Regions:
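Conserved glycine-rich beta-strand-loop-beta hairpin in the small C-terminal domain of fold type I
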Residues: 311-314, 318, 331-346, 356-375
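Conserved core of the PLP fold type I
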Residues: 73-212, 217, 223-246, 251
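N-terminal small-domain helix-loop-helix segment of the aminotransferase-like
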Residues: 4-115, 166, 321-324, 328, ...
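Conserved core segment of the aminotransferase class I/II
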Residues: 244-336
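Short beta-strand-to-loop capping motifs
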Residues: 272, 374-378, 412-414
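PLP-dependent enzyme catalytic core of the Aspartate aminotransferase-like
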Residues: 2, 92, 96, 100-102, ...
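Generic structural signal for small/hydrophobic residues in well-ordered secondary structure
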Residues: 30, 48, 65, 90, ...
Length: 436
């Protein structure tokens, strides 16, 4: 059976890297196999494993950061709470595109949402000794679980695939009722499945978070990228869906990486509700000199981690957020290309007997966006991921994202125009070699 890349090349590299179960191969392991296979074979790979922005950084941010550096900002430490212009811009941005009010004091810059998540985990897990476990609504970003492993915090997970709509509440309550859950974590839109939790589902999450005094960490890394709706007009509905309408127990993690393609500078904001920011918890007060939740997050956790966020990058994010909410910069228009790529890729895969694993948001077809998921009849995740390597296509298995479904995560960010024909040609051979 002929394949575009000889099996011996791929299998040899997999063995060389010590990967015994390809279903559990990490993103960087898959990337390494793909890069080395491409070099050894001379055959171009269609790389779909890395979730890296495939667009230029927003120029308005670059210009503002360069100006800040030229003005001499690099010599001084940034305020641990963040520069006022960014805090104000973040507050206005949240109002403009989410439709909720958070005071500037609760909008705190972080060194990428990764740091925001780490500091949030630290703060949430220490607020109450009885609440020592984080709950993930999976699938999700695997590195967040690694963060908890690094800090020694327990976590539980469930795959939301079979628990959408009215099934979500009872499933959540089965965990929350035990009294040990300090935080609920999910991304919306979701990495890797691209499902978008609906308002009625977010309402259930919010109401249960209030009932069981649990904090919701809403990861908005792919902000406003539900391309089924026009979320691009500031201060006008429809808005980005959020749990913030249904509880005061929330933290919003907003990243500059995907919406503004500003990943390299590691900049984001964590927005803490006004009520939670000022709330006192006995265990936090005892440990941190009587400080309430918000100042513990910033003046203890963030201070200990990095003593602030890059001064010049804060000016970049402030400029991008301000240009967006003033209607001068349509960030949604810039990232729309990811949706177009997903639509074309899905058509090719589905034409050759693949199927979309997470294919619905309740009664509505899933949006096209930065990620989507694929499966192939009769193949496990590991089998499919390895088999596609022989065809010069690389992607990661859903099991690494906490999913219980057999399939792969496909990222659209690195797809180039000439690769659609290439993929069509290779998937035609794949289908012939793997008849169903």
């Amino acid at each position: 059976m002929e394949t575009p890349i000889k099996k011996e090349i791929v299998d040899g590299l997999v063995a060389e890297l010590g990967i015994t179960d390809f279903a559990k191969a990490t993103i960087r392991e898959v990337k390494q196999v793909a890069a080395k296979s491409e070099k050894a074979s001379g055959v171009e790979f269609i790389k779909m494993e890395m979730g890296i922005p495939g667009l230029p950084a927003a120029q308005v941010g670059v210009d503002a950061q360069v100006k800040a550096l030229q003005d001499g900002i690099a010599h001084s430490y940034p305020d641990i709470q963040g520069i006022p212009v960014l805090k104000e811009a973040a507050s206005q941005f949240v109002k403009a595109f989410i439709g909720i009010d958070i005071k500037p004091e609760g909008c705190i810059p972080v060194t990428g949402s990764m740091q925001g998540t780490f500091a949030s985990f630290l703060t949430c897990s220490q607020r109450d000794k009885q609440k020592d476990t984080v709950l993930f609504i999976d699938p999700g970003f695997p590195v967040q679980k690694m963060q908890l492993e690094v800090m020694g915090v327990k976590y539980q997970t469930f795959d939301v695939y079979d628990f959408r709509g009215e099934k979500l509440g009872p499933k959540l309550e089965s965990y929350l009722s035990k009294g040990n859950i300090c935080a609920i974590v999910y991304s919306n839109p979701n990495n890797p499945s691209w499902i978008c939790l609906r308002e009625e589902e977010l309402q259930v999450i919010g109401e249960l978070a209030t009932k069981y005094d649990t904090i919701v960490m809403e990861d908005l890394a792919y902000f406003a990228m539900d391309f089924r709706k026009d979320l691009s007009t500031p201060f006008k509905a429809p808005y980005q869906a959020t749990v913030a309408r249904y509880t005061d127990n929330y933290m919003l993690l907003i990243s500059g990486s995907k919406a503004f393609s500003y990943a390299g500078e590691r900049i984001g904001v964590t927005c803490i509700s006004d009520a939670l920011f000022h709330r006192h918890f006995d265990d936090l007060s005892e440990r941190y000199q009587g400080l309430p939740f918000g100042p513990v997050f910033s003046t203890r956790m963030l201070y200990a981690l990095s003593s602030g966020t890059s001064h010049s990058a804060q000016y970049a994010l402030a400029a991008m957020l301000k240009a967006a909410y003033e209607g001068k910069y349509d960030f949604r228009k810039e990232v729309n290309v990811y949706g177009e790529r997903a639509r074309k890729l899905k058509e090719i895969f589905c034409r050759h007997k693949f199927y979309v694993v997470y294919d619905k948001d309740l009664d509505e077809p899933i949006a096209d966006g930065f990620y989507f998921t694929i499966g192939y009849p009769g193949m496990t995740s590991g089998q499919l991921a390895l088999e596609l390597m022989y065809y010069g296509v690389s992607a990661i298995c859903l099991i690494t994202c906490g999913s219980e479904q057999e399939g792969l995560r496909v990222c659209t960010s690195f797809i180039e125009d000439h690769q659609y024909d290439l993929l069509e040609e290779r998937m035609k051979i794949f289908e012939t070699n793997n008849p169903r």
